[in-house]
Amino acid sequence: MEEKKKELEELKYQSGFGNHFSSEAIAGALPLDQNSPLLCPYGLYAEQISGTSFTSPRKLNQRSWLYRVKPSVTHEPFKPRVPAHKKLVSEFDASNSRTNPTQLRWRPEDIPDSEIDFVDGLFTICGAGSSFLRHGFAIHMYVANTGMKDSAFCNADGDFLLVPQTGRLWIETECGRLLVTPGEIAVIPQGFRFSIDLPDGKSRGYVAEIYGAHFQLPDLGPIGANGLAASRDFLAPTAWFEDGLRPEYTIVQKFGGELFTAKQDFSPFNVVAWHGNYVPYKYDLKKFCPYNTVLLDHGDPSINTVLTAPTDKPGVALLDFVIFPPRWLVAEHTFRPPYYHRNCMSEFMGLIYGAYEAKADGFLPGGASLHSCMTPHGPDTTTYEATIARVNAMAPSKLTGTMAFMFESALIPRVCHWALESPFLDHDYYQCWIGLKSHFSRISLDKTNVESTEKEPGASE
């Protein structure tokens, strides 16, 4: 335990997003002047991992070179995992999911007392598209209470974006190690092998998975050169490796939504040095620099985008990761909570800690909601009535102690059968809007509005 604590304290990272990094656990382990020499330093094997096709445009091309004690190919044949994992989906159809336009909300999933690791505790909520066709996404959740023992997970289907809500994640990857706390996120790109330990025991969180794309920083447009998530705040691991025999070590590979296992006699985390721009990374959401309206109206949630996975259509995302962090609310003559909305995009929301400004109760940390394409949603009755009651006392206020987030996609998700049959599904969610009453009156127009309509266009005071 003391050794693990020391490792946590001494962990070092490299800063930047999309950088070409280089890292050595032993000085001189990286070859000079070429990627694949006849003999690598220290007798290592050279192995490339490609995150894009070889002929992808240079500005989009992602790959890394790993210099390892033994190559990844040294394993027994893959076999279907027994017992099969029946709650992971990457091909969404009527056999495993169904469409549902109703507003959906789930209470936090209980973390079981019986031993369960990240792989067995991972289950799909909803998604669209297909990992086979390299287009789509899946949203999962996980509950776990023990680390992965003598095993590593590899997702051949797509990239994972991990959002821990309870409990830290100690993630060992082929590029090094990451410690990810609630309030931080981690991205594990397609194909990387990783193992998750749980320093705090019980753990719960959310996972977004994308097929056929990678996350990137959103364009800032008129915001300028700075703001939102800064490149310098993304952290990649530094090289670290394990050597020696590990009999019966298991690689668990997710392939087409199914799990397969292969045995080998060494740890996959035997990379002594590496270089490239295809790497796992983490980000602290507290470092996000939010923007907001400073005079009137409520800004669109896109101003809080941390990462985006684009489609071929400009401005349309396969998946956006958006947060709702602490911030000042100062807009005048404005309904400050999120507005009522019907969206051509589908919105899955989660809550890491605190409370969400549009829901007075019922939306809990570790819970989730789904508002699909063109399904109406917005503040609950309590929030609306409390807000309009303060019409004459709208001083600037600060949202504190909260961190909600949203996965937003242009694709329409199908919801897994078990998610719709879950005991944690809130069947009374719709009740939070039933109390919204009509305030319409032909004679109670606001005096300010009356005066403004009586003025001539362009007239001064």
Swiss-Prot record:
Pathway: Amino-acid degradation; L-phenylalanine degradation; acetoacetate and fumarate from L-phenylalanine: step 4/6
Cofactor dependence: Fe cation
Xref: Gene3D superfamilies: Jelly Rolls
Cell membrane among keywords: no
Catalytic activity field: homogentisate + O2 = 4-maleylacetoacetate + H(+)
GO MF term (any one): homogentisate 1,2-dioxygenase activity
Keywords, in A-Z order: Dioxygenase, Iron, Metal-binding, Oxidoreductase, Phenylalanine catabolism, Tyrosine catabolism
Entries under InterPro entries matching the protein: HgmA_C (IPR046451), HgmA_N (IPR046452), Homogentis_dOase (IPR005708), RmlC-like_jellyroll (IPR014710), RmlC_Cupin_sf (IPR011051)
Binding site for Fe cation: 341, 347, 377
GO cellular component: plastid
E.C. numbers: 1.13.11.5
Family label: Belongs to the homogentisate dioxygenase family.
Name of the protein in its database record: Homogentisate 1,2-dioxygenase
